[in-house]
Amino acid sequence: MSKNAKMTNPMKVITGPNTRWSYANVWEPKSINGGTPKYSVSLIIPKSDTKTVAKIEAAIEAAYCEGEAKLKGNGKSVPALSVLKTPLRDGDLERPDDPAYAGSYFVNANATSAPGIVDADRNPILTRSEVYSGVYGRASISFYAFNSSGNKGIACGLNNLQKIRDGEPLGGKASAESDFATDDDDDFLN
């Protein structure tokens, strides 16, 4: 191995640039059901992005192998990966009524510490309105095994985000720019 070869973490994935961010709680942590407040985002990955999907599947497998002792717990054997809860989910099956998830997989990633957020040129994004549910970008995520309160599986941690381009906001609210994009200045008094 050469001196310049990078050590890679088999459980870490950088998604492709066409990943869409939904439920983007990346500026302030939110608590769910009184639990630990966390930063989170749902990453919508087109099924056509087979490279990212393959990297996620390999990272889940690596997290399973690395976490076998944790997954075994007090049991006699490690449960098969196929019976465990894993974070890569099919939007067509689990969110059939949400067009944003059609033809896509999704991964919910979260962290207790704030993710770093940069633009396409790797400059920090500090303006909150620049990052919203609906933008497209890459995400740095890591997979790990968990065994807590009788629940076992593989989870996804959120590391960093890189916004690549704007997208139609998700959540039903149009942006002011799109609402007033027409040149139709009808005189409403006539």
List the predicted regions and their residue ranges.
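Beta-strand/loop nucleic-acid-binding surfaces
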Residues: 108-126
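Beta-strand elements of well-folded, non-transmembrane domains
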Residues: 45-47, 143-145, 165
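Exposed beta-sheet edge/beta-hairpin loop segments within beta-rich domains
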Residues: 120-137, 144-154
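Short intrinsically disordered coil segments
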Residues: 57-62, 122-124, 172-183
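OB-fold ssDNA-binding interfaces and closely related basic DNA-contact patches used
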Residues: 1-106
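Acidic, gly/ser/pro-rich intrinsically disordered tails
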Residues: 1-13, 168-190
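OB-fold/S1-family single-stranded nucleic acid-binding modules
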Residues: 148-168
